Amino acid sequence: MHDSVLERVTLRRSLGAKYLTTPAPSKEDYAEALTWAIAAPDHCHLSPARFVVIEEREKFADFFEAGALADGADQEGAQRARSKALKAPAMVAVVAKIDEHNERVPTYEQWMTVGAATSNFLAALELKGFAGKIVSGSSTHYRDAVDALCKKCEVIACWIMLGTAKPDAPGAEVLSLI
């Protein structure tokens, strides 16, 4: 492995939306990242992770707002939830299908595969010059978002907020040394 690749991946840090700017990854960038994601360890080749690029951001902002209101948020809280779907230049959903009845592959192994695939996905995008952060919490359970993305027996494991790191992002001084 090239030392520069290893160094770049080990210097990767999560960067929230306020530290991200355009450009966002292209379809080609996502395709390459997916090849890394599917290379994750996967006992019995269950492929428990799917990555969905969210192109209809306003629609998902509506889902986040409605979900927050359904969870009891006031109008200000609902607007904060809404803004989370729009802040980063790009948003990807990690959808997991965990087979709880699989006798050969326990659920914890399947979740480890989802995590490894997500890590590989992020590492590939990092090597292409992008940055991002995994976000979970209540937004992964908002009914409209789940209904829009998930098939039977699937859940939203997390969201990945992506873009290009701003020059003043934490760790930018380290990345500039590469």
Question: Residue locations for each model-derived region?
Answer:
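N-terminal amphipathic, basic helical "cap/leader" segment at the start of enzyme domains
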Residues: 1-88
